From Swiss-Prot:
It is found in: Cytoplasm; Cell junction, Focal adhesion; Nucleus. Catalytically inactive protein kinase that acts as a scaffold protein. Functions as an effector of the small GTPase RND2, which stimulates RhoA activity and inhibits NGF-induced neurite outgrowth. Promotes Src family kinase (SFK) signaling by regulating the subcellular localization of CSK, a negative regulator of these kinases, leading to the regulation of cell morphology and motility by a CSK-dependent mechanism. Acts as a critical coactivator of Notch signaling. This is Inactive tyrosine-protein kinase PRAG1. Residues 184-205, 217-248, 372-470, 484-854, 1163-1206 are annotated as: Disordered. It comes from Homo sapiens (Human).
Amino acid sequence: MHQTLCLNPESLKMSACSDFVEHIWKPGSCKNCFCLRSDHQLVAGPPQPRAGSLPPPPRLPPRPENCRLEDEGVNSSPYSKPTIAVKPTMMSSEASDVWTEANLSAEVSQVIWRRAPGKLPLPKQEDAPVVYLGSFRGVQKPAGPSTSPDGNSRCPPAYTMVGLHNLEPRGERNIAFHPVSFPEEKAVHKEKPSFPYQDRPSTQESFRQKLAAFAGTTSGCHQGPGPLRESLPSEDDSDQRCSPSGDSEGGEYCSILDCCPGSPVAKAASQTAGSRGRHGGRDCSPTCWEQGKCSGPAEQEKRGPSFPKECCSQGPTAHPSCLGPKKLSLTSEAAISSDGLSCGSGSGSGSGASSPFVPHLESDYCSLMKEPAPEKQQDPGCPGVTPSRCLGLTGEPQPPAHPREATQPEPIYAESTKRKKAAPVPSKSQAKIEHAAAAQGQGQVCTGNAWAQKAASGWGRDSPDPTPQVSATITVMAAHPEEDHRTIYLSSPDSAVGVQWPRGPVSQNSEVGEEETSAGQGLSSRESHAHSASESKPKERPAIPPKLSKSSPVGSPVSPSAGGPPVSPLADLSDGSSGGSSIGPQPPSQGPADPAPSCRTNGVAISDPSRCPQPAASSASEQRRPRFQAGTWSRQCRIEEEEEVEQELLSHSWGRETKNGPTDHSNSTTWHRLHPTDGSSGQNSKVGTGMSKSASFAFEFPKDRSGIETFSPPPPPPKSRHLLKMNKSSSDLEKVSQGSAESLSPSFRGVHVSFTTGSTDSLASDSRTCSDGGPSSELAHSPTNSGKKLFAPVPFPSGSTEDVSPSGPQQPPPLPQKKIVSRAASSPDGFFWTQGSPKPGTASPKLNLSHSETNVHDESHFSYSLSPGNRHHPVFSSSDPLEKAFKGSGHWLPAAGLAGNRGGCGSPGLQCKGAPSASSSQLSVSSQASTGSTQLQLHGLLSNISSKEGTYAKLGGLYTQSLARLVAKCEDLFMGGQKKELHFNENNWSLFKLTCNKPCCDSGDAIYYCATCSEDPGSTYAVKICKAPEPKTVSYCSPSVPVHFNIQQDCGHFVASVPSSMLSSPDAPKDPVPALPTHPPAQEQDCVVVITREVPHQTASDFVRDSAASHQAEPEAYERRVCFLLLQLCNGLEHLKEHGIIHRDLCLENLLLVHCTLQAGPGPAPAPAPAPAPAAAAPPCSSAAPPAGGTLSPAAGPASPEGPREKQLPRLIISNFLKAKQKPGGTPNLQQKKSQARLAPEIVSASQYRKFDEFQTGILIYELLHQPNPFEVRAQLRERDYRQEDLPPLPALSLYSPGLQQLAHLLLEADPIKRIRIGEAKRVLQCLLWGPRRELVQQPGTSEEALCGTLHNWIDMKRALMMMKFAEKAVDRRRGVELEDWLCCQYLASAEPGALLQSLKLLQLL
C-alpha cells in the first residue's frame, strides 16, 4: 500500500468487526474484524485525518460480495457487494476554496464506493445516486436527482458511491455530495460518473456496512455519521453502528484511501464517510464514476440530498461535524472497507488508491507515458470500477504498481468531467500525494465544475463528448509523480484497459452497449463509465490489460512482477470472484480498470459494467492483485479445488463475454492490445514471463460457450473475501481472504499465482499487470460476475496500439512472450489451455496466455478464443494459419502476413478478445456448442470414424467453424485498437504534434497531416484539416455507424484556427509545424479539424496516377490489386447500407489508402502500423510511430510506390461524408415510420437513392483501370436510356478484365431495379479473386444440383487449404497474416454453393 501509516488504534476495531459473524477467521487475523492484525496496525486512527497517513486498507475479512458460495459463513447477508472506498489523493481544485481547508490535516479525499445494503430503503436504482464527495463548496445537491437516468436504475440500487472529492475546509462541506448517477448533474457537472451496479441486495448491504465501517473507522467521523455507521455497522468497527441495511451487508468493499498530507482529502474522506452513510441505501455502483456525475463540480452538484436513504438519515450536518476526523476515519474506514475488498485498495491509504485502477494503472503504466501530468487523476470514470459486484474489487483501487513500488504514493484516478480543467492537478501515487499535500490536489480536485482530477490531469481538454463543450474524462494516474512517472491515462469506455494513450475510442461507449447487453450490468455504470471512459479515452493509455481473472479463482498474485506493489485490491476476488468484481487486476488505468467495457478501454469498462467491474477490479486489484496469490493457499490450489466453480464462474464471465460478443471483441481487442502494451512495458517483460505464467489459468474453460454463458460457476469458497492490503512496496495480496486470507508478504507480488481463469485475456492482462506492478489478473469467480465479460480481451495489447503504447513508455511490447501452447491447448479437442506457467498446476492444462497476448480471445465465438492470437492452440485456432501452407496456391492464398502476424506470436493483430473464447476456443463446433468436456467433444468427432463420408462432413464443419474464428481474429489483428471509439475536442488540440511539416495526403475534401498525441505517443493520428469553408463543415460528422475497417473514424472534430500555409497543396513548401499551432501565424483561417486514426499516405486518385506504368507492365498484378480495393470499398459500403447511410460522393479523391502491412516478425514487429497503426497496432506502437513518421509520412508513401510497402495490399478508407444521406426508415421515430409506410414506392425509392453508390462504384471501376468516366466521354448516355452495349469496353489485359467489365456493366445498369446491389457486387469480386474458375463449372452435362455438390466440395477444399496456409504462417515468423488472407477468410467463411452459383451467373461463367 502506500506506506503503512500508523492509524489510530481505532482502526483495530475495524468497522467490519460488527459483522465479524459474516467473516471467516484465518490464522494471523484479527478475531474481531478478521483482518490481518498487521493490517489493524496499518489501519488505525480514524479520528485523525492524515492525508499522507491513510493506512493501507485494513484487511477485513473479505466478504463474499458476489459469490454466494463464498458467502457461506462469510456474510450473513446473502451477497455482499464489495465496497470500494476510494480515497483519491486530494486534488488541488482550480477553485482554491475547495481545498482551502488545510484544516483537514488529513485532507484525504476518498471516494467510497459502497453498495447500499439491500435492507436499507434504497432509492430506486435510478434513484440511488452515487454520492461523490468532491470538493464541496458547502453546496448540497438535491437528493432528488439521485435517481438518474444515468443508468442507476439499471444498476440495482446496490451500490452507492461516495466520492470524497475535494472537501472544503468546513465540515459542512461534507454534506454536499453529488449523486454520481444524476444524468442532469452529469450534464451540469460534466457527467459525474455513474456506476454500473449489479443487483446484489445483500451485497449492497455489505457494501454499505463496509462503508459504514469505514466511516466508523474514522472515529472523528463516527459521531457525525453515526447513522451512516449504523447503516454500515459491520464495516465500521470503531463506530459499530448497525444500520439496518448496513448490518448484514458485510460485503467487502475496497477502500482506497488516498492520503495527501495536508490535503483536504481527509475532509473528503470524512465526507465520504458521511456520504457513505448517506447513501447507505444508494444503489449506484461506483464502478463508473461518470465524469459528469462525479467529476462535475462535486461540490456543486446535488450532494447531500442525492442520497435520500440512509444518507439522509446521516445528514450532511452530522458529517460536517466530524469532518476533519472523519476524513481520517474515512481513510481508515476505507481501509476497513477494503477488508471486504480484501484489496484494501492496494494502496489502502494512498490517495492514489482512490481509484483502484488509477493507482494500478499509473504504476503499471508509469512507463507507458510519463506524462508531465501524473497529477492527472485517473478518471473517476476509470474508477468506474466494475459493476456493483465488481465494484468491491475495483473499489479497492490498487495503487499503480510501478509507482507504488517506487513509492508508496497511491495513484489516484480522477475523472474530469469537464474538458475545462482548471489546472491539471498532479495526481500522484498515494504516497506521493500523501507526501505532497492535498494541495498537490490529486487529480480529483474539482476544477471548475469538473473534477480537478481531469483538469488536474490536464486531460481536461479531453472530452468524452465529441462536442467540444462536453467535458472529457481524463484518467490521471499519478503514481510517483516525483519519479517522473506521472502518467495521465484517459480512461476510455471502450478500452477496458483504460490506460490507453489514445482517447478511449467511442467504441468503448459502444461497448457500453455491450454492457447493456450483458446481464443489464447497469446502465448508469455503463453510461458513466462510458462517459468517463470517453472523456478519459482521449488520454487513455494502453493500460495494462486488466487481468481478467476470468471468473476463476485468481490464483496468481498479480504482483509477482516487480510491480511489487501488486495492488492487493482485488484480492477480494473472493468478492470479486464471487461478485466477479475481482476480475483481477485490471492494470489498465482506464477508468478504474473497468474491464467490463473493455474495458475498459476496450469498451469493456463501459460497455459491460458487470464485466467492466471485473476488469476494473482487476485493474485495481491487478495492480496489487496479490490477494489471490496470497494466501495460504495459492490461488492455484484453490483453482484446482474449485476448477468446476471456476469453470462456472468462467462460464459466467465467458457467457457474458459471449453475450457481449462483438462488443466484447472490441473490448477484448483493447485488452489484447493492452497486453502487448503490457509486454511492451519493461516491467511487462519482467513480469511477463512470471506474470503470464503466474497468471496462467489453470481452470478448465467451460466446454462450450453457451454453457459458459448460461451457467455461472458457484462462487469459489469465500476466497473472494480477500482484503488485500496492497502495500505499494509489499504488493502482496494481503489477506487473500480466499484461501487463508492471511496477508501475503510482499514477496507474493513476485509469486506467480496461477489463475484458474479460463480467459486467456486474464493472462494477457496478467502479463500486463506483471509489467505494471505484477498484479496478475484475477478471475472473476462470482457467478454474478459471470454475466460480465471477463475482459478476456485484456490480452489484446499487441493488437491495440493505443493500449500498447501507453503500456510502456513506449517500450516495444514484449511481444509474444514465449508463445507457449500447452498440448492441451493445441489439441483439437482440448478446451483448456495450460498457461505456460506451471503455477496453475490445475488439472486443466494452462495456456500461457501472457506469452501470447492474443492467446486469449475474447472472441464471441468460442472458437476464436482458442488461443492467444498468436498461437491458436485449439485445432481451429492453430489451424487458423493453415492457409499459409498454400500460399502458393491460387490467389485466394495471397497473404502470408496474417499468419505470420498471428503466428508471429507477438502480433498484436492476433489479439483475440475472446478470452472466454479462448477457453472454449475448441477446434470443433461441438466444442463450441457443447458444454460437455473436451473428451465428450472428441468422442463425438471420433464417433463413426470408420465412415469416410461422415468424417469428411465433420472435417468440413470444423473448417467452417475455424474459418469463422479466423475471420474474427483477423479483424482483431487488423483493427487493433480501432474498434474503440475515441473522442477529442478542441481542448485536446494542444496534445497533438505533427510528425512532419508536409501533409501526408491531399484528398478531395481535406489535407491530412500525420501527428502524434502526447498522451498516446505510441499511436499515430491523422489531423484532417477540411478544405470546405467552416460554416459548411462545422456540422461535419462521420456516419453514426459502428467502427469499420473501411470507414474513416471520426475521433473528434472542432473548429480551429489553422495557418494558411497548412492548407496549401502538399507540394508547396510548408513552414515547419512542429506542433499543431495554437498560436498560428498572422495568416490563419478557421477550419474544421478532424482527428482520425487512419493516416492515409495517398488517395485512390494518387494510386491510379502513379500506377499507370505498372498497369501496362504487370496488368494481372495491377488489376488483381484493383479487385482488392473494390472489394474493400464494397465491404465499407455494405456496412454503411446496413445502417441506412448512402455516401453519394464516391470518387477517387474520397477513397484513402492506408498502409496495412503487419510485421510478420515475432518481435514487436507484429504491427506494421498501416492498418493497425491507425487503430493502434498495439505492439506496433513502436512500429506505428515509424509508419506514421516514416511510411505514413506524406512523402514516403507515394514516393516509393514500388517499395516493399507497395507490395502489401493497402487498406482502403471511405472518407468525406458531407453529401451522405441517411435513409428515413432507419429512425426509431414511430410517427415517422408511419408516415414513411404511406409513401408510394417510387417516392420512397427516389428519396433513398437506393442504388446511388452502386452506380458510382461502377464508374470507379473504369477510373481505377485508367479509363475515363464513360458518362464524361459519352455525354449522350446521360440523355437517353442506355444499354450495356452502349458503355465503352474495358481493355482485356488480364484474366480479371472480363469480370471487371461485366461487373461495371451490372453496376451501371440504367434501371435501378435491375442494378445489382453492393452485396452482390462484393460476391462477384470475391469470385473473381478466389474462384471458382470457369474450368470447374463449365463441365458439359452437369445439372445444377450436381454443380452445387461440386461447389460444396470446392469450398471445403479451399477452406482446408486456407487453414493449412494459416498453420504454416503461424510458425513462419518471417511471414505474417496479410490483408488478403483476412479478405479471403471472409469469403470462404461465408461461402455457400447457392451464392456461388448466383455470382457465376452474374459473371456469365455459367
